[in-house]
Amino acid sequence: MIYIKKKVFNDIIFEDLCYDLEDEVGIPAAIKSRGKEGMYVDLDIRSAITKHLDSTHYPDFCKEIEALAEEFSPRHLASTISVKELEYLSYGISDHFKIHQDAGHGSLEHVRRFTSITMLSKTDDMIGGQLSVFDNDEEHVIDLQVGETVLFFSTAWHQVTAVTQGGREVLVAWVYDR
């Protein structure tokens, strides 16, 4: 299995999450594809409005993502992993993220194990903005509906095609070993 997709949150928890994010994210505080402070992001590779969030502000969300990771890969018990990074992404016209992996390089304890993407909102008229995860040369198009989450190994190649109409907002969580 290359990924797991499901509705992780009930409607009330999801609405609370969106409300909290709306307060914290505010577009003036978000940065158009500049990445973390001091980092340059090549706009040919990635274009979106981004905001890094403190995962400790969203403990219920993080617990659900950790449980989903355990369901996806039972050898990774929720007690041995934790969400350490959250990022809000808003994709508008021409925004995209070319094929890439999320697993970084470095010591094993600092390598992302899982990537999750939760669809917060998308316009009814959205064209493009398609998420694909690749298994060898096979492309798996993942049609996330609002409120759904997909989780996959951070070593999996994936991409978001350019949005040509409408837009989408997602919350990305990265899970590490504790």
Each language-model region and where it sits:
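Non-heme Fe(II)/2-oxoglutarate
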Residues: M1-T80
